[in-house]
Amino acid sequence: MARFVAVALLVLLSLSGLEAIQHAPKIQVYSRHPAENGKPNFLNCYVSGFHPSDIEVDLLKNGKKIEKVEHSDLSFSKDWSFYLLYYTEFTPNDKDEYACRVSHVTFSTPKTVKWDRNM
């Protein structure tokens, strides 16, 4: 019984130590298919390698939040860092600008990454 309590305590201490680790998210913004003006596509924002899991992600059109956005379930990698995919349908053109804005404890202010149609 004492051995079980000691092991349980060790596990709890190890898990609480994970919360102290902070890793900034890597942000990648891309379209599902090569961009063609007037042709429907999907805009993706892949956010990975972050810890802790609390994060806010917004897709933007001309600096304004896009309301109809879907996302994957929060998942974690072998190193216990987290990743998410946010996406929405959009139709690219020459006048609109798209971006992904991320708020995380590792950033003093939200970070915005613009979509580059040539990537």
Curated annotation (Swiss-Prot):
Signal peptide from the UniProt entry: 1-20
Main localization of the protein described in the UniProt heading: secreted
Keywords: Disulfide bond, Immunity, Immunoglobulin domain, MHC I, Secreted, Signal
Residue pairs linked by disulfide bridges in the UniProt entry: 45-100
Superkingdom classification of source: Eukaryota
Gene3D superfamilies named in the record: Immunoglobulins
One GO biological process term: antigen processing and presentation of peptide antigen via MHC class I
Entry GO terms, CC: extracellular region; MHC class I protein complex
Family the UniProt entry places it in: Belongs to the beta-2-microglobulin family.
Name of the protein described by the UniProt record: Beta-2-microglobulin
Lineage, top ranks: Eukaryota, Metazoa, Chordata, Craniata, Vertebrata
